[in-house]
């Protein structure tokens, strides 16, 4: 299904789902008729820069933008196609936006993320009214005493925290046969492109919400593929930062050597903006000391239109066989990269891995029609 057509058709028939946690003040319950649409703001594919321009001109405010995203969440996450990507909404989101609008009126703009709504994965501590559960019923009632270090950095940058996204429970570290995007607390998250398929995990909620334009930007976490896989499946830009570039303090852990949070956005520029905002040395996470002198607060300076020129890009050979439509799309993308100056190299990675005796990777595809 064409992404833009799907997003425009957010009124597909579905059964209403009550949000977990409190709905932000001034809003009726999901599915109710008590709230009129607050703005005609078109959120489809909108970027951080475009939102900032609207706030700077006075055409929009952080409050109006936040309300527009909340309306969209009501329409297609909690009703309509019911993506079920958001496990909990932040009841303080509008008041946070109000405070940031006041700062702007008083001449203070913290940076490119000032007043920008964000969703973060439910294994990242937020020291507020929301829970941090990794999607598990075992942790229902758990409220963190303070923000995770990276969440503090993002708040300092001026984001409006809309809520938490669903995930594969315990970030998929619970079973060798678990289904991506399912948690006992949040249920099953759907792919916004194919509603009877999961959006890949474990940052499934951030992937689905980002693709459906339910927030300007999202944060996921990765041990092994949990940012880049849902980003790839949902046509997003996902970055797994070098471990230590973003602090891991306050994030429910799996691996001391592989874990990190990372950006999930719809454009490379937005990913670069979010990446810089999350960096910082954290005395509680010694590995962040390795980023001293190597990190920056602005990665957008490295974005170049001719950035692919002279680069060699490997393409796994097995992806060039099978479904003809997918192969056609991949080859078209390869052609675009070649016209931008890249050299495409077909490589065989999977065969040597099989020879090493790696276990078969199992993919769980949810089929809502058959249960």
Where in the sequence are the language-model features?
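C-terminal segment of classical bacterial N-terminal signal peptides
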Residues: 20-25
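N-terminal secretory signal peptides and thylakoid transit peptides that target proteins
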Residues: 1-14
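Structural signature of FAD isoalloxazine-binding scaffolds in flavoprotein oxidoreductases
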Residues: 228-233
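Short helix-loop capping/hinge segments that flank enzyme active sites or metal/cofactor-binding pockets
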Residues: 114-134, 297-316, 365-371
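Charged, often glycine-rich, active-site loop that binds/positions anionic groups
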Residues: 133, 176, 180-183, 356-371
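A short helix-breaking turn/cap at a secondary-structure junction
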Residues: 28-29, 34, 240-333, 351-354
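Gly/Ser-rich catalytic/binding loops embedded in alpha/beta enzyme cores
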Residues: 16-19, 33-224, 242, 335, ...
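Acyltransferase
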Residues: 66-67, 98, 298, 322-350, ...
